[in-house]
Amino acid sequence: MSEPTPAIEIKDLVYAYGRAEAVHGLNLTVPAGCCYGLFGRNGAGKTTTMKCLLNLLRPQRGSVRLFGLDPAKHDVEVKRRLAYVPDYVAFYPWMTVRETLDYLASFRSHWNRDTESNLLDRFQLDPGKRTDALSKGQRTQVALVAAICPEPPLLLLDEPTSGLDPIVRREFIETVIGAYQEGDPGKRTILVSTHLISEFEGLIDEFTIMDGGHDVLTLGADQARGRYQKIRARFAGSVPQAEFPGALHIKRNGRELELIANGGGPEIIEKLRALSPESLSSEALTLEEVFVATLK
């Protein structure tokens, strides 16, 4: 049996602005039906990658495929199957929210009006308000409504919570994304580009960390939590001088020792136990902590 076609497949992608390479040899595969995180600091190359997927930029080397299709050759067919929310949203300023959504719905073969009504209520958006009177956060909310109502197979989100207050961010993450994926389990895919990793912790299935245009780490979320550990030991006296092969980072503070382990946690714990600490504990890293440890 052949492997299912990924929602997104990027191979050896390169894109430069003049002499400055924004993306350098990026490889990334997003299986259909998952919520995939593209993590990186500002300037890591995330938005350039998104623009290549949307055919707003053409890869200078390498390739991108969505549902097995080259967006440069199948632009309309690909765009019918996705929705995109950028980090900055602009609408026709003279239109109301209602007119804007009706206008955008006219380009779609399907539009879930029940979902639209529900989201407008949840976001407390006034359909009669002109878009030029909306705050940045409200414009983002309208864009999210417009992205989710067509119920596309693929949702591309570039810093989607930018400009939203903490309460609305939580509402968006817990309710909106959840509702989108629950509508057609296994078929709806999300690629979310963000540096606010903790906010998406419970939704991400797999992720890639980008730095300087490169993919530096790709893992399943559960795999990352099982591999990366934070180990703490407290001693009666000063921290013994010892080597800990496999520790990514070591921090000594008085009588306390903290280590970040990547796959070597059990061996490090046994070595620490032999040093007779007063206390010894370990816990899985969050995805944000994995991100920080990887780029530190």
Describe these PLM feature segments.
Residues 62-73, 77-78:
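Conserved ABC transporter NBD signature motif
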Residues 260-296:
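C-terminal coupling/interaction segments
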Residues 8, 23-25, 79:
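Conserved structural motif at the start of ABC-family nucleotide-binding domains
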Residues 155-159, 164:
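Catalytic Walker B motif of ABC-type/P-loop ATPase nucleotide-binding domains
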Residues 171-265:
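ABC transporter nucleotide-binding domain
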Residues 39-41:
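The feature captures the beta-strand-to-loop junction immediately N-terminal to the Walker
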